[in-house]
Amino acid sequence: MKAHTGKDWFWYQMGPQERSKARDLIHFSHWPQCEKWFENNHHVNFLRVDTTETENEAVFGSIVYDQGLGEEKDHTVFHFYITRQYFFTINFDFSILREIKGKEVVRQMERADNAIEGFLILLGELMNAYLIGVDEFEVKLRKLRWQIKDDNSKSILNRVHLLRHELMIWKNLILSAKKIEMALKETFLPQNEGKKDYQRTQLKIDRGFTYISEFEGELNNLLHSEEVITSHRGNEIVKALTIFTTLFTPITALGALWGMNFSVMPELNWKYGYLFSLLLIVTSTVLIYLYLRKKGWTGDMLQERKKKKKPRKRRTL
């Protein structure tokens, strides 16, 4: 167990094997509500507040603070218990967070006035790691945006779905941070609402949700565009098959007549029977094609220019 000291408050950072020490830190008045949560170490995204006694409030729970993209079970949970004088965490590991230096965060936390503000700094650093991940997601989205311009294959549609899945994971992680921030505000604020660290954490969470909302809208637009293109291609295939079947109706009908074995077949003695039949097939096929073309049933539903526009040169001052 690591004990970090602030201004009249403490943070006890514990490993998963130190639950017995954490049990001793839970106030006896909070234990009736904490017992079910504490005894079950398999809780995921559990959050409760205890405001029964004034000046002795507490927020406790468990959240997933790291989630892999491949498997649902590939996640890391940390547990926390927060009061006005101290808080403890179980299984919180700075090394999991992207580009976050634990020692610098601890030094920043030690300057906090109370335990609530200290935990808000920790929550803010958690959001910093999430925002870094969201920035990396934006790079992937930008690449996909330009790939769709030149390639509308099935693999692109699959990539859109994969990015939507990744975005949902980031959204859920940020939502967990938002839930804790709201619980702290409900339990201990407004005394910390004007503090800069609380405001910074709140703004980071709002920034994360703004990014997520914008990316969701763009992915939905990309998915809708891909669905329209897929539907159009399906319609083109059905239309082509229909036209193909219609154009070959004359030769099919004539072939069916030739296949009949009636006793009287006058065309057997015609000198130019084959020539006449071929002319009849070609003429009827052309007439049917001209009729379909006149109705506009053979043209593309979406006219595509084969010639690509040359990119405009940027003007330089």
Curated annotation (Swiss-Prot):
The record marks L241 as: Important for closing the ion permeation pathway in the closed state. The keyword Iron does not apply. It is found in: Cell membrane. The keyword Lipid biosynthesis does not apply. InterPro entries: CorA_cytoplasmic_dom, CorA_TM1_TM2, MgTranspt_CorA/ZnTranspt_ZntB. Induction: By secretion stress. The record marks N235 as: Essential for ion permeation. The chain crosses the membrane at residues 240-260, 272-292. It is a multi-pass membrane protein. GO terms for molecular function: cobalt ion binding; cobalt ion transmembrane transporter activity; magnesium ion binding; magnesium ion transmembrane transporter activity. Coiled coil: none annotated. Keywords: Cell membrane, Ion transport, Magnesium, Membrane, Transmembrane, Transmembrane helix, Transport. A motif (Probable selectivity filter) lies at residues 259-261. Its main location: membrane. It comes from the Bacteria. GO terms for cellular component: plasma membrane. It catalyses: Mg(2+)(in) = Mg(2+)(out). Homopentamer. In the absence of Mg(2+), interactions between subunits are weakened, and dimers, trimers and tetramers can be observed in vitro. Homotetramer. The central ion permeation pathway is formed by the first transmembrane domain from each of the five subunits. Mg(2+) binding strengthens interactions between subunits and leads to the formation of a symmetrical homopentamer surrounding a closed ion permeation pathway. Low Mg(2+) concentrations trigger both a conformation change within each subunit and a loosening of the interactions between subunits. This results in an open ion conduction pathway. In addition, this results in a less symmetrical shape of the whole complex. Mediates influx of magnesium ions. Alternates between open and closed states. Activated by low cytoplasmic Mg(2+) levels. Inactive when cytoplasmic Mg(2+) levels are high. Belongs to the CorA metal ion transporter (MIT) (TC 1.A.35) family. This is Magnesium transport protein CorA. The gene is corA.
